[in-house]
Amino acid sequence: MEEKQERRRRIVLIPAPAQGHISPMMQLARALHLKGFSITVAQTKFNYLKPSKDLADFQFITIPESLPASDLKNLGPVWFLLKLNKECEFSFKECLGQLLLQKQLIPEEEIACVIYDEFMYFAEAAAKEFNLPKVIFSTENATAFACRSAMCKLYAKDGLAPLKEGCGREEELVPKLHPLRYKDLPTSAFAPVEASVEVFKSSCDKGTASAMIINTVRCLEISSLEWLQQELKIPIYPIGPLHMVSSAPPTSLLDENESCIDWLNKQKPSSVIYISLGSFTLLETKEVLEMASGLVSSNQHFLWVIRPGSILGSELTNEELLSMMEIPDRGYIVKWAPQKQVLAHSAVGAFWSHCGWNSTLESMGEGVPMICRPFTTDQKVNARYVECVWRVGVQVEGELKRGVVERAVKRLLVDEEGEEMKLRALSLKEKLKVSVLPGGSSHSSLDDLIKTL
């Protein structure tokens, strides 16, 4: 990464209050800071980031709002986003106005632009009022954005009927979105389709934005990126995988248990399946027990992340679960793990994931094949692409049974099919690595972005 340069100007960033959105936003912030820009992060009380020695060069400001702290949990992400955007539109204008007053006497502190998470679309109106350049940042991929846009158009023509009618129609392919089925569209598990579409209408509206940054790679999504360019008619900058472009301080909700690395050090190469279903996924007790039984039957080693409170209606501890499995030498269970370190470890041969975009990029960036068990929104799009387009994993659908778990694990860690996926995953890893090096597509895209700011 380049040395820090003389400060150019200041960029204001607005992350969405979710771990999967904060991490790439801070990676983007670090990349821009290393290119010479001063950074201001505008956030609500729902964000997890706090000023620290790792972020000493960043300015943090709080967008005042009066939503109860319980809203994020009680409303669910979709209804919460709708309410948060309405609440923050006026207060962010005041916030931005005060920031401009503070900086106007310092020429080098002039605000170059406002970069906002696509789901924090209230920022567009405020930046427009002060005639500041606006840039949308998508922490998800280009295909997911295309799906959200398509859903808005389909909804207007009652084209989402297969999602509502059931009777097997959800298995039908969506026109012009091959290989995606209606069931793969990024609907939310927390709200009806109508509410999701309401969010998508605003998040997919470029408004007066002058550009869009996406945490993706050209070699992964060339057709979706071309579609996006034609649809939005503004410059699109695919600069990912951002975790390979710049490091950022940890933004984990939970403390990472690094003892699992010591355990991995004792395992054979490519012998362990790493299981982590992200920071939101909730499981029924029955599903956890079926997974445990399937892992036992597979006769393979596993590192399993089970967050506190992620098993519905159960007080079963990780220690109790491992004891019930009666295979203490073959498994290790932690509350949270340093995922990048885990995926980079030579002992890890497969990743059972919810397929959040950050996790998917991190897995592909290390050449690790995936077992996909998506839960909500873009995870379903990502899982379908992992299996059918990039062909570096398999998707587990339907009811979770021990036999299904056992077969999926063996497919990746034991069968010849898994070896073929591993080779494709390693090839993809090299392509991603090249993309962020000088001359690579993402490196060049970042340079092009910098020239416009």
Swiss-Prot record:
UniProt name for this protein: UDP-glycosyltransferase 76E9
Q: Which residues cross the membrane?
A: none
Entry keyword annotation includes Ligase: no
- List the keywords (alphabetical): Glycosyltransferase, Transferase
Show the InterPro entries listed in the entry: UDP_glucos_trans
Task: Write down the species.
Answer: Arabidopsis thaliana (Mouse-ear cress)
Query: Which EC number(s) are documented for this chain?
Result: 2.4.1.-
- On whether Phosphoprotein is a keyword of this UniProt record, the answer is no
Into which EC class is this enzyme placed? transferase
Q: Which family does it belong to?
A: Belongs to the UDP-glycosyltransferase family.
**Which residues are UDP-alpha-D-glucose-binding?**
279, 337-339, 354-362, 376-379
Q: Which Pfam families match?
A: UDPGT (PF00201)
This entry's Gene Ontology molecular function terms read: UDP-glycosyltransferase activity
